Amino acid sequence: MNKAKGELIVTTDADCIVQPQWLKLIASLYQTKKPKFIAAPVNFHQENNNFERFQSLDFIGMMGITGAGIHTKIMRMCNGANLAYPKAIFIEMKGFQGIDQHASGDDMMLLQKIAKVYPDNIEYLKNPDATTFTKTQKTLKSFINQRVRWSTKSKGYEEKQMTLILIGVWLFSTNIFIAFASSLLFGSSFLMLGLGQFLVKMIADYRLLKTTSTYFNRSDLMQTFVKSSLYHLIYIVIIGFLGGITKKYQWKGRKIH
């Protein structure tokens, strides 16, 4: 950071692909609104099977929630594969001091650290041409490790309302899962309860994913919506549970404890 000569720090990951207008769009937003932090969209691409398409559809939904969360100031999220902030604000906030004990999540924690002081100066770059692209996880093991990593970093979030929302989503999904499991022992009443709750979840998810997939020109992913809904329910329950009880996972050759 000390060697950076520019006014604005822009970050992405080494395995990401950026678009021709990427930096221009970030610079334009910065010059227009002078925000203290800019979050921008990230998508997966080059999927080869339904498992990878599920990841892409799920991630596109996260981007929709990211934009809405920043706009409403209810739950501010970002991804280090596409964000920007002024060098001056990084120095003012003493960088990652106070959050550098966490193995993952420094992007989100820095955002929330800045938002605590400048709640009205956080922007989301709503432009598909500013999207950066990375690839999905190829195996179930790497997918679980990735999502456990995301889940465990929530313990360091400054904005506790985000944690409460995530817990609420997990509890609702777990309730559906329990209803389906209970129907095997206690009959059709639990099955109907589970189906009713699952239908509510699917309707809410469909409205979000239809809008965001269209916006990012990935309407093709909606062909896997029904299967993805089943995957999503199972993974939310399992990953939420694992993220709550463990700090251990593997990521890019490293074992995190």
Locations of regions flagged by a protein language model:
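Acidic donor-binding/catalytic loop of UDP-sugar-dependent glycosyltransferases
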Residues: 14-29
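Membrane-embedded multi-pass helical conduit in multi-pass membrane proteins
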Residues: 162-165, 169-247
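Short glycine- and hydrophobic/aromatic-rich loop-to-beta-strand nucleating segment
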Residues: 75-85, 108
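Catalytic donor/gating beta->alpha subdomain of glycosyltransferases that bind UDP-sugars
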Residues: 30-63, 91, 97-162
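Short aromatic/hydrophobic "clamp" motif used to bind/position activated sugar donors
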Residues: 9
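Short, conserved alpha-helix that lines the donor NDP-sugar binding/gating region
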Residues: 1-2, 111
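Short acidic donor-binding/metal-coordinating loop in glycosyltransferase active sites
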Residues: 6, 14-16, 42, 106
